[in-house]
Amino acid sequence: MPSAKSPRRKAPEPIDLDNPQYYFNRSLSWLEFNKRVLHEAYDPRTPLLERLKFMAIFSSNLDEFFMVRVAGLKQQVESGILQVGADGMPPAEQLQAVRQYLLPIVTEQHRYFDQELRALLAKESIFLTRFNELTPEQQAYLNDYFQAQVFPVLTPLAVDPAHPFPYISSLSLNLAVLIRDPESGQERLARVKVPNQFPRFVALPQHLHSPQGVHWLGVPLEEIIAHNLSALFPGMEIEAYFAFRITRSADLELETDKADDLLIAIEQEIRKRRFGSVVRLEVQRGIPPLLRQTLMEEMDLEEIDVYELEGLLCLNDLFAFMGLPLPQFKDPEWQPQVPPSFQRVEERESMFDTSSEITTLGTDYWEAVANELFSLIREGDIIVHHPYHSFAATVQRFITLAAHDPQVLAIKITLYRTSGDSPIVSALIKAAENGKQVAVLVELKARFDEENNILWARKLEKVGVHVVYGVPGLKTHTKTVLVVRQEAGQIRRYVHIGTGNYNPKTASLYEDLGLFSCREELGADLSELFNVLTGYARQRDYRKLLVAPVTMRDRTLQLIYREIEHARNGQPARIIAKMNAITDTQVIRALYEASQAGVDIDLIIRGMCCLRPGVPGVSDRIRVISIIGRFLEHSRIFYFGNNGDPEYYIGSADWRSRNLDRRVEAITPIEDPAIQLELKERLEIMLADNRQAWELQPDGTYRQRQPAPGEAERGTHSVLMARTLKDVQGSH
């Protein structure tokens, strides 16, 4: 008899990598990130005042989320846009999901602050108390403060047929007051804005502290106003009062390629922003339904837009407590260090008397110190890591020395965000006054920094700086400086290419990297990039730089697919990428293909991550962590194993569609072996973190790593601070 044939095994169905189930929604992923920020406020290992800071950061982040993301989703719904992202969730569904996810989180935040953090503060003699809990003497002091300081500033606004509902500014704190006319018995509504010219939390003087030894004792300003409402409405009965706050859309609607004058167009849009549509209403719990309904109707809001919360509103203002001189309740102070590579410059500088004003230092000083710095860069590439390394002693010094050095002919820089009293801008003004060619790209569309940047643009233009506002249709996000210097009869170009803004204030809080180099190819690339930004050049390729929106997407995909080829050929294949967010579908799909091919992938993503790790057959070999702590992780680092010949890159871009397609970005290769080793070690420290790292689970939640029993804590920030001190001390 013929033998029975064994049944043929059916080939597995190919996995559809475009299936929405393999992608997280970016709005919900962002909310997960902010939830990790809030966890720092709940974590008893976080110093007490730092816990208030994280409460404030969470609330401030959330304000921006509503002003931009929720406002954008609402606009899509109103415009009938049904387009969905890779996760397949339409805008209306996203708004519902945001509400469903967020309401319990903010409810718990307010409960925790009101019931638990306030008690913890009181235990440490920091009393944020209620007005009616004060002694008569303390109340009298605050009533006098109200009459002398606050009352003259207040403008109570009635709401009735003769007084239409007043304009409410975005994010302002207000009191809705229900008053009753005792003669007519008629109830009326009034609004009192809590002025922001005064401290939100009003401190009582030391002599009124009871008992003595109290660190701080104070009351929220709105409670002082509320207990003095009779002074604002004499002859009326105060029936009830409740705090409320609104959030308006802050998205600029600007067609940059159609604007004749971008600066004027943006100024006009900023003015319009004040009147953006209301996207959220926050009210104190217990507000009468009629009052709540009136506010909703006047703001044209639905139930989904209203958040009824316990206790204080606007917890952003808790930032103020970080100003208390109580170091025992804060993180140990960190002093950014001068990196060993820059200590030579410090030593050269110390040979001069620098006690006088910087403007009086002579040419011999500037020449000597600048020569030291530029010769240092000529000896080899240098990388600096902020805030471990001092921004003032490295990047700021580089720009300041270039501004004064007689041999420097030109300085070109991109400014995305800088500080209000920017020494960078001051140095650029000085460079122009010293007769150098100075070109500055000021990105006017840097969200919420538009007014600041307009101010600097005008100031720079006044002294003859060539100021440009970017490329039409694109936002310039690259962090680059080009210094052109005359040396021994030849021109040499020096560059700084970084991951963070040229902002001294955020440089002490944000973790960022910067490369100093005088490699000819990088200098040539940066010259051509600035020509694109300031002129009409259309550069299609670059020697070394990955530039968006020209080469970065294609080159990134090539690097991923090269690792796939190595894995398919049985060779080692590895990708490590650190950035703020990954949301681009094409890049995520390529990473899924890499995982399927056998490439080991570690992603260090602080914020949004639409990639779903750990899915069998799709992303088994992809691991994602997020590091949250005292510094904001902001650097972008990319490592590709390349079969034992690794390539490293740093730069300004995340793997998001906006960075790859709608922004001017620059990523530079790191080719110096010593710097490559340094980056590798720093990535390994982050991947080994068991204190600040959170692991992304396949269901979209995050699990915080904890040290095993008997294992020492390895927090990225504390490890790198200790390592920096050791490196600096070892170099002396």
Swiss-Prot record:
It catalyses: [phosphate](n) + ATP = [phosphate](n+1) + ADP. GO terms for cellular component: polyphosphate kinase complex. One of its GO terms (molecular function) is polyphosphate kinase activity. Its EC number is 2.7.4.1. Residues 699-718 are annotated as: Disordered. ATP binds at residues 61, 510, 606, 634. The active site is at 477 (phosphohistidine intermediate). One of its GO terms (biological process) is polyphosphate biosynthetic process. Gene3D superfamilies: Endonuclease Chain A (3.30.870.10), Polyphosphate kinase middle domain (3.30.1840.10), Polyphosphate kinase N-terminal domain (1.20.58.310). An intermediate of this reaction is the autophosphorylated ppk in which a phosphate is covalently linked to a histidine residue through a N-P bond. Its cofactor is Mg(2+). Mg(2+) binds at residues 417, 447. Catalyzes the reversible transfer of the terminal phosphate of ATP to form a long-chain polyphosphate (polyP). Belongs to the polyphosphate kinase 1 (PPK1) family. HAMAP family: Polyphosphate_kinase. This is Polyphosphate kinase. The gene is ppk.
